[in-house]
């Protein structure tokens, strides 16, 4: 089901070369509070890499439908626009992606010890990780957000 578009004019989407079908913008990396806040854009009709969340998180879907798939490829869940879902670290590995249109979803990762995501192969073996260190480097490499000051 198509939803109203989320205004992304002020977002300079970033990508990672080995993770297709997803773009991101990092809003916060706070080592002291152990928070990593990210806006993701998932391609319509595509799935990202198999992964596992290593920190508790909440998601808020801002555009489209976020589709969650089990490691077998079976559709597990559809989160429509406006869905707010909390998840726990070390849940079931999964892939995710968009339905009929690109999905934009805000992820707030909380209580991050070091790892945020484990990237998995088809046998559920860890092939890469993304943690506080990597997200700090990606955040620092982003262009600054436009100023919100009026004067």
Task: Show the residue positions of the predicted features.
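A short hydrophobic beta-strand segment most commonly corresponding to one strand
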Residues: 85-86, 100-117
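Glycine- and acidic-residue-biased ligand/ion/polar-headgroup-sensing regions
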Residues: 44, 53-72
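A short, N-terminal "cap"/entry segment at the start of jelly-roll beta-barrel domains
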Residues: 1-34, 120-151
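Short, contiguous, helix-prone interaction/anchoring segments in small proteins
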Residues: 29-40, 107-109
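Asparagine-centered strand-capping/turn motif at beta-strand->loop junctions
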Residues: 96-98
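Short acidic-glycine-tyrosine-enriched beta hairpin
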Residues: 31, 72-92
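Conserved short histidine dyad/triad with adjacent acidic residue
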Residues: 34-52, 88-91
